[in-house]
Amino acid sequence: DRPMVAKRSLQPGDAVIVLGGPAMLIGLGGGAASSVASGDASEDLDFASVQRDNPEMERRAQEVIDRCVALADANPIQSIHDVGAGGLSNAIPELLHDSGVGGVIDLGKVPKDDPSLSPMQLWCNESQERYVLGIPQARVDEFAALCERERCVFAVVGVATAEERLVVGYGLLAPPPANAGGGREGVALAGHSTPPHPSPAHAGEGVELAIDLPMDVLFGKPPKMHRDSAHPAPPQWPEADTDALELRDAGLRVLAHPSVAAKSFLITIGDRSVGGLTARDQMVGPWQLPVADCAITLSGFDGVTGEVMSIGERTPLALLDAAASARMAVGEAITNLIAAPVASRDRIKLSANWMAAAGHPGEDARLFDAVKAVGMELCPALELSIPVGKDSLSMQAQYQADGVAQKSVSPVSLVVSAFAPVVDVRARLTPLLRRDVESELWLIGLGAGRQRMGGSTLAQCFPDANDGAALPAFGGDAPDLDDPQRLRALFELVRDAREDGLLLAYHDRSDGGVFAALCEMAFASHLGLDIRLDGWGDGRTGDPLRVLFNEELGAVVQVPVEDRAAFADLVARHGLIECAQRIARPTTAPVIRVSDEDETLAEWRWEDLFDAWWSVTHAMQRLRDNPACADSERESARRFDAPGLQPKLTFDASEDIAAPYLSTGARPKVAILREQGVNSQIETAVAFDLAGFDAFDVHMSDLVAGRFDLADFNGFVACGGFSYGDVLGAGRGWATSILERNALRDMFAAFFARQDAFSLGICNGCQMMAQLRGIIPGAEHWPTFQRNASEQYEARLALLEVGESPSLFLRGMAGSRIPVA
């Protein structure tokens, strides 16, 4: 909503509020410490710089902000700023300066969990999940009521002043009323009805000043930093001798390299479906393998538009050429993003995360080269902007090893995130190959035949073949984006071919080269491949290892054989004919074969290549989780003939079964019940609204305060989310808040005893209801939730079969097999 985007100016007398978690001795110097080499600072600062998170508090703060935004023009928030690097010392002055006002800040009002914090620690710590915001004095009580409902800590810590001066200390604001209550949250909520004001002359009994200075001192024009750095001598890495390598061994080693291998062990431990708007996560196809190029979310529950996000990084190349590494990072972000239907290139926005070992000899010069290459050359050529980003300039660590001082230095690193609106999320392309159409795979290589191997995964897999040293054969020319116009042409080619119905699948070429891209498509689809190296339109051939394992930018697309001519014509019209090569054909045999003309160069069993690709995930899961579960998953995943997820419905999903019951216009009322930290109430409410219910947002604090009564509803749904901790058994905290309050216990018991009402528990809400079985008729034998066999949180699609059940939710669905997250 555009009116909610622009900040309004604070007026003198407006309250300055801290919303969110309490201050603690964490992240002290976190943002600053990210620009201090590890080992340079004191041990105490190193420990204090460690960041810790509290997602439940973040959820509570976000709910307060959402409730304010929902008021539209009546939103009480005039301006808001997140608390990041520098803590309150940065956030509050910026909030005031943006409005051209000063402020008086009372550190004694800042919520804190550590009473020993000094003024500097209280002002500068970077405890997370906090915001600072400005609100008119007349609306502080209204804002306090929202915070109380969401059980979110907040405090009025100051007041805006007409004089552009920052005054910080203790005893500067009027004290809260004597009956304000105690406790951390009580203090945070106390005193909001008394307009804070500066003590006279900022001095007097009980007043302690820590800061008193003009805002210009903070926001004037400081002198620009000047740094001198010289380019170091080019690194003398040995260059890979591909003539000495055996193709079959190379394929196995590259797929087992951590940069290429499957990352399922990192993905299944995180919830990817919360919010109900995920259209594309990492896992692709019936076998749910992590090969997606980008993430796509829906922009709402009632349409097909959405947003796409992708990432690009090629940090190892910076050891050879920092500018090339940066250009390749931008290019990879775009080639990943192309899988989604973005209407035009100018809708793409980038975020740049720069990292470097600033001050280390030569690294400042490399950083300058990389920033110049992207910011002043490549992005202007692509007509792309980088409106946001961040940096960490301390990418080096000092330590002692056997009494000898050592230093570890990371190369200049650029991680690019690309974002764009999506016109129709259903038109996305994935690496999943279509099996029902005779097709071929085309490589569009933006190197236009160049096969630079410097810094490649293949080079990292082999020592110098000439002397057998441990040093990888990492050298040679690094791949690069030589012509930005080719990247623009690839974007437009894929967009036009998609609209013409010429593409069935898409995957970018990156780490591991086209061989890795092709294998990932084969793994995701449980198909074999016949890879041919003689498919260039002009008859070009080359060194098989360089063709297969160079990591120049590019993409592989699946094209129906019957559309070959139309696609080739489109390639030519976009000026990419010298970049295009027919490189493979899908097969149903469990074999991946590489040939040139009529000669077979290498052949692998599908399972052998899959085992190599899965090896990192398998090893990590065996170390972290239950080894037996890791072994079982590998055995299941590596079966070429595994059926995968095969959904089956025994009912018509388009039938509106509620229509006959709603013909009178009376919609049953359902309470969407949530507790602090719950995060799935919106999609739950939408689901019931679409099913014909009137959904009401009911917080547990509403039941405690008597604002709602379950007796007024036909049903309630206890929603999911990390209330009282995102751990097994967290629902016990929610249940205890009911069982230990007689009024709530009686309310829930009476509701469960009704014959004309229903209840549903989801995720944490299900755990909560399991703890209420003592007041639920017929629930005496309900099972308890136990730790799973893998001993790890598992976020996977499970194929569930619906049995015969008296549940009104499952009536008429028996025999259906449905993937459930």
Spell out what each predicted region is.
Residues 2-5, 119, 425-429:
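Short alpha-helix capping/helix-loop boundary micro-motifs
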Residues 341, 785-821:
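An acidic, glycine-rich "communication" segment
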Residues 596-762, 766-778, 786-797, 801:
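N-terminal beta1-alpha1 cap of cysteine-dependent amidohydrolase-like domains
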